[in-house]
Amino acid sequence: MSKFIEPSNEEIKLEKLYQDMGLSDKEYDKVVEILGREPNFTEVGIFSVMWSEHCSYKHSKPFLKQFPTTGEHVLMGPGEGAGVVDIGDNQAVVFKVESHNHPSAIEPYQGAATGVGGIIRDIVSIGARPINLLNSLRFGELTVKQNQRLLKGVVSGIGGYGNCIGIPTTAGEIEFDERYDGNPLVNAMCVGIIDHDMVQKGTAKGVGNSVIYVGLKTGRDGIHGATFASEELTEESESKRPSVQIGDPFVGKKLMEATLEAITFDELVGIQDMGAAGLTSSSSEMAAKGGSGLHLRLDQVPTREPGISPYEMMLSETQERMLLVVEKGTEQKFLDLFNKHELDSAVIGEVTDTDRFVLTYDDEVYADIPVQPLADEAPVYILEGEEKEYNTSKNDYSNIDVHDTFIKLLQHPTIASKHHLYEQYDQQVGANTIIKPGLQASVVRVEGTQKAIASTIDGEARYVFNQPYEGGKMVVAEAYRNLIAVGATPLAMTDCLNYGSPEKKEIYQQLIDSTKGMSEACKVLQTPVVSGNVSLYNETRGTSIFPTPVVGMVGLIEDVSYLKEFKPKAGDKIYLVGETRDDFGGSQLEKLLYGSVNHEFESIDLSDEVSKGKLIKQAIRNGIASHVQTVGKGGLLVTLAKISAHYDLGMQAQLDVTNAQLFSETQGRYIVVVKEGQTLDIDQAQEIGHLTHQQLFDISNSDVKIKENVSDIKQKWEGAIVQCLTTQD
């Protein structure tokens, strides 16, 4: 008789308890078909997390298959803990982005902290040493107190974990819109460096080889976290705080160092982080990839308290844990290593030739499941989409109050400086950060070399909402431009697809069209997708977030020497590269003046992005440019103001655009600051002004003149978020 009191197989079926775990009737029937019998409580739990949206991608898998995943530099693409891309000299960059949206909505500090911890372990499980962190965040408007609380908690959680573990946070983006009220997005990205011959895989093979557990003892925190992440947020979500894991960065640091030492042992067969779905996903996925069976003895699993059942052990998402497969007879070598690092560890099972996933506790069988169907036969749903109807009436932008609009945009939290938030992150730990958070992509030196890795993370949610296909192209191109702007060669990307419920036709269509656009951009820009994540059901009280695909992209700088002089000075000339058109659909201007976004915009020219990017990168590397900035949210006038305020330099410029076009967000444009005495020889480049010692921001077109003290602009731009966070309801 079992020592654990659980519902019987019959009770599970009759009372449909499997529905509470996230399985539909059809999915339960498929489990019965696979097993040839009714599943027990532990088996239902295992199938429910492995077949959850978060783990199986059952609504998004068809779209992921269209992404290009191979390329000249790709060493390892999707399917492992992170992507691996060659950077020369037998070295590679390892990177991935993951979401932790639902947990952060319920418990913002721990939700964000464990998101950072989890993505770090993904990189470490490949065998790479992390060199920097990035994040992409979305919140509701800061006029709402709850959104202020969420922002403060998330930023504190990111800083609290990253700072303690000793990895700099070097770049990111934060946007605010009421569509994220109660449903923030927290996407964390990590980048690491590895030698080619040290790359590890999450595989279990070699009959008789041992399975080793290492890290924090298993508790009851995070049970059904993967299922929770696959549901819409409701009034009842607050009761699911136990589904939010608790992070311990100090143990995380020990685990990271121990893992990086363990990968040097020839006897290591495979390794995987215990992330979403905990011990269930790590062990079953390793068995599936190795074409093997596994027998886990759960009475050997280190636990935080007595009485934890097999069901709870398998579904717990206790943080800071790794699972290893090592050669038989070498177990003590690994256990001694982990003991040296003051980590709990134990041999909990072995690889078998049965092709079955068997769990026992005190020799009693609690699960006996065929490996391949569990890992590979989750149902895939192809649904019907429905095109969104656009507002065909034209918005009127002919009578804009330029000065008032300029100040309002500059102070909107989406555009305003994030300095107050970034200063809570350690940006320099490790002493290899060359370009810190601010205006550009980050640049981190590869230690011991002249090389550096540039990285950026970007999203364009309003544009994807307006025109999903074009918006999908746009978000990839934006990341590409941000790497070009620091002189890097874009190599590859990772993505995080954040959407509402795919069961709603309009949202499913957004998923179809935006991923198609992203795929096309990846092919033209030659930035294959090597890793990623999908987060669906981002809805609160029936209201969906904007469709928010986020792109993390890395680029290579072979020699960082030019960056020593990559800083603008008074006397430098300012060029605008690219044409400015009447592009207002999806823009900050449309949102500011009309309260919503629902107008189409012009398509993006990807071939032009490539040719223009090559010329600008060449100008940077040849020492002609002292700063390059992509023209982004808020348009040309706002972009110029941000450069002036960031560098405390005066600026004088004459712009050949209309009043409304000062705020147009036409894609594919750059501001290139050229060193005094140099010229920019690019067809689409137009000299528009210069930087000055005078602390005046003096910009005009044929109709209006904006003349402000740089200090006033800086105060408005840098002080806006602080003011929002100190404003009481």
Swiss-Prot record:
It is found in: Cytoplasm. The active site is at residues 54, 100. It catalyses: N(2)-formyl-N(1)-(5-phospho-beta-D-ribosyl)glycinamide + L-glutamine + ATP + H2O = 2-formamido-N(1)-(5-O-phospho-beta-D-ribosyl)acetamidine + L-glutamate + ADP + phosphate + H(+). InterPro entries: PRibForGlyAmidine_synth_PurL, PurL_linker, PurM-like_C_dom, PurM-like_C_sf, PurM-like_N, PurM-like_N_sf. Substrate binds at residues 99-102, 121, 245, 317-319, 535. GO terms for biological process: 'de novo' IMP biosynthetic process. One of its GO terms (molecular function) is phosphoribosylformylglycinamidine synthase activity. The keyword Nucleotide-binding applies. Part of the phosphoribosylformylglycinamidine synthase complex involved in the purines biosynthetic pathway. Catalyzes the ATP-dependent conversion of formylglycinamide ribonucleotide (FGAR) and glutamine to yield formylglycinamidine ribonucleotide (FGAM) and glutamate. The FGAM synthase complex is composed of three subunits. PurQ produces an ammonia molecule by converting glutamine to glutamate. PurL transfers the ammonia molecule to FGAR to form FGAM in an ATP-dependent manner. Monomer. Part of the FGAM synthase complex composed of 1 PurL, 1 PurQ and 2 PurS subunits. NCBIfam families: FGAM_synth_II (TIGR01736), PRK01213.1 (NF002290). This is Phosphoribosylformylglycinamidine synthase subunit PurL. The lineage of its organism: Bacteria, Bacillati, Bacillota, Bacilli, Bacillales.
